[in-house]
Amino acid sequence: EYINFLRDKKDMRNSTIGKQMGFLKWFLRWSFKKDYHQNIAYDTFKPKLKTTPKKVIFLTWDELNKLKDYQIPKDKQYLERVRDVFLFCCFTSLRYSDVRNLKRSDVKSDHIEVTTVKTADSLSIELNKYSKAILEKYKDIHFENHMALPVISNQKMNDYLKALGELAEI
C-alpha cells in the first residue's frame, strides 16, 4: 500500500520509491534495536521495483581530442572557457560541482587536493599534461573568491557545451 501511495499519490518513480523504502527500513531497524517494537517482517520485504538502466553517455578519446583541438570561431570565443572547464573535468574525473569549488590554494605543482561536494571525500588527484596546461592558461587571471578556473553556471555551461558539440560536429 505504501509503495502504491508513493507511486500514485506522490508521483514518485521507482528509484525514488526504493530510496524511501531504504529510509523506512533503516528507521524500523533502529526502532527495533531500541525495543520500540518486535516486528521484523520488514527485514525480509523486498519489493520488486522495475528500474530502467541508465544509459551512460560519454565521449571517446577521439571525440575528446576533436573537442580539444577544435578551432572556436572568432565570434564565439566565450566557448573557449567552457571547453577548458569541461576538458578539465574530463581529464581529472571531477564533477562540475567540484571544479566549480576548486580554489587556487587546492592546486599544487603536480596534483590538486579537493573535498568533493557530493560525497565529501578528500581526494588528491594527479594532474596530467592536459589538466596542467589548462590550469597554467588561467594562472594569472583573477577569478572571484580565488577560484582556479572560469566556471559559469551549470545550466549555461550545458547550453554552451551543446552548442560547442554541434559546432565541432561531435
Residue ranges of predicted features:
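Short, charged phosphate-coordinating catalytic segments
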Residues: R29-I40, C89-S109
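DNA-binding alpha-helical recognition surfaces that contact promoter or target DNA
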Residues: K19, W26, N101-L102, D159
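Conserved helix-loop functional segments at active or binding sites
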Residues: F5-D8, K33, D69-Q77, N101, ...
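Conserved tyrosine-mediated DNA breakage-rejoining catalytic core shared by Y-recombinases
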Residues: K46-P47, T92, N101-K137
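Short, Lys/Arg-enriched alpha-helical recognition elements, typified by the DNA-recognition helix
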Residues: E1-R29
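Basic, Lys/Arg- and aromatic-enriched nucleic-acid-binding interface segment
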Residues: N14, G18-G22, H37-Y96, I141, ...
